[in-house]
Amino acid sequence: GGGLVIKILTEGYPVVEILDTMILQPQSEIGKVRRFLNEHNLQITEENMVEEDGKFYPMMKVIHGKKEEYTICEYTYGKRLLLEQHPVLKKYLDREMQIKESVFQQLFKHQNSASAAERMEELKQEIILTQEALKYYE
């Protein structure tokens, strides 16, 4: 996952420094990986995403570079994927939106509990972020 990618890059930094290019495929915490790369002047020059058997696999080409400006949405979903209006990312975003809205509706029925109300608030923020990403496709 993403945590392991960050650990490998951190512990292996002497090797990272001499590499011209890296291809990374974090399977979780992808936003954290993007943020880590940017904070360490490692620039994502290309991103791709594929889907197989209903699972989505992001990948990125990384070189030494300089820090870039990223929004939270771009860290979360991939600046290059969003700017390119990547079709597989669009499919992922549509699915995420359906899932989040469905969970929100289920929680709405049980909003009396504090934990449901708290999760609903988290979901609202996630839905807003996903909607922001979907605006790239308009």
Residue ranges: model-predicted function:
Residues 1-13:
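Active-site segment flanking the S-adenosylmethionine/decSAM binding pocket
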Residues 70-138:
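An accessory alpha-helical subdomain
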Residues 28-32, 37-69:
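Active-site capping/gating segments
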Residues 3, 28-32, 99:
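Short alpha-helical
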Residues 4-5, 33, 58, 89:
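Amphipathic alpha-helical interface surfaces
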Residues 13-31, 43:
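Conserved beta-strand signature within the Rossmann-like core of class I S-adenosyl-L-methionine
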